[in-house]
């Protein structure tokens, strides 16, 4: 093996096995492209995106780490979300959630999304 080389296991690598998943339809109602990264709390994604945010609380994209999904203006696509793992804590992002994702934390996040107007049609 050469210094700096990457040695990858043979076979198929399964990610997020055993975690709750959800398919959600997303439309970009904005005028600019929106890109969402693999570990971003999806309920807090850009306000120009229209989707069922209450079901996305505590979820992120079910894609490999370090990758992202791009939504072009006017585009509608279906993505798969996966439950946030580990300690299930969401910090920062757009300030809608800063909590552990238990039922109480999900209620707090939903309340913040409603106050910000993000539960209505997408922000244009």
Swiss-Prot record:
Q: What is its EC number?
A: 3.5.1.5
Taxonomic path: Bacteria, Bacillati, Bacillota, Bacilli, Bacillales
Its domain of life reads: Bacteria
What's the family? Belongs to the urease beta subunit family.
The record's keywords, sorted A to Z, are: Cytoplasm, Hydrolase
Q: What CDD domains does this protein map onto? A: Urease_beta
Location in the cell reads: Cytoplasm
Pathway of action: Nitrogen metabolism; urea degradation; CO(2) and NH(3) from urea (urease route): step 1/1
Primary localization class, coarse: cytoplasm
Coiled-coil stretches: none
Q: Name one GO molecular function term.
A: urease activity
The name this protein carries in UniProt is Urease subunit beta
InterPro entries linked to this entry: Urease_beta-like, Urease_betasu_sf, Urease_subunit
- Per its UniProt record, what HAMAP family does this chain match? Urease_beta
BP-aspect Gene Ontology terms: urea catabolic process
Q: How would you summarize the oligomeric state and partners of this protein?
A: Heterotrimer of UreA (gamma), UreB (beta) and UreC (alpha) subunits. Three heterotrimers associate to form the active enzyme.
Provide the catalytic activity annotation: urea + 2 H2O + H(+) = hydrogencarbonate + 2 NH4(+)
């Amino acid at each position: 093996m050469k210094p700096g080389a990457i040695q990858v296991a043979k076979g198929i690598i399964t990610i997020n096995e055993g975690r709750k998943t959800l398919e959600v339809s997303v439309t970009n109602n904005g005028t600019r492209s929106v890109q969402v990264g693999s570990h971003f709390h999806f309920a807090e994604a850009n306000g120009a995106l229209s989707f069922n945010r209450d079901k996305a609380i505590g979820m992120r994209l079910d894609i490999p780490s370090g990758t992202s999904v791009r939504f072009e203006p006017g585009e509608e696509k279906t993505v798969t979300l996966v439950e946030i793992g580990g300690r299930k804590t969401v910090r920062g992002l757009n300030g809608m959630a800063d909590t552990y994702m238990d039922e109480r934390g999900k209620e707090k996040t939903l309340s913040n999304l409603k106050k910000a107007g993000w539960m209505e049609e997408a922000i244009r």
